[in-house]
Amino acid sequence: MRGRRFFYSRFLVSKDINLWDMKRYWLFKSDVEDYPLSQFIKDKKTAWEGVRNYQARNFMMKDMQVGDEGIFYHSNAQPSAAVATLEVSALATPDKLQFEKKSDYYDEKATQEKPRWYCVNVCYLQSLKVPISLEAIRSEKDLQSMQLLQKGNRLSILPLTEKEYKKLLKLGGL
């Protein structure tokens, strides 16, 4: 008898696979002016706050686990580029900025009892030896299906396949 199947992000997975035991990989985008790599290195660990897209929020709430790894990517930089690696260090908790009236990320519909926005903690692992520009990513045949390259994709957090993650590490000199 055939097992039921379901879609997890972009991946077809059998019901017999325990997704919680699988390490996942992510691309975390940050505007270079909002949170530069130099600040991430100094902080060593940060709450990934300010995500205001439901799909990206759901990745953090439902899919990310402690130990998942990712690429820190500077958007709106000259050039935009993958610059470091990181690791998810704590599960999703309510994003405190949604409750702060003076914050750019304040959400008047969010309450302590029913928060709308969540964030995970991530810790800095290491800088790539060679930043990987968006142009370099586009030119790699093995990375053509990356969600980062899909037209209209503006999410601040994107899933990566293990193959994409390892290719980015290689391109970055790690």
Task: Specify the residue positions occupied by each region the protein language model found.
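Aromatic- and Lys/Arg-enriched surface recognition patch
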Residues: 84-151, 155
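Short, charged beta-turn/beta-strand-edge "cap" motif at the junction between a beta-strand
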Residues: 73-79
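Short hydrophobic targeting helices and cationic amphipathic motifs
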Residues: 7-12, 19
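Compositionally biased, charged N-terminal/linker segments
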Residues: 18-66, 164-165, 173-174
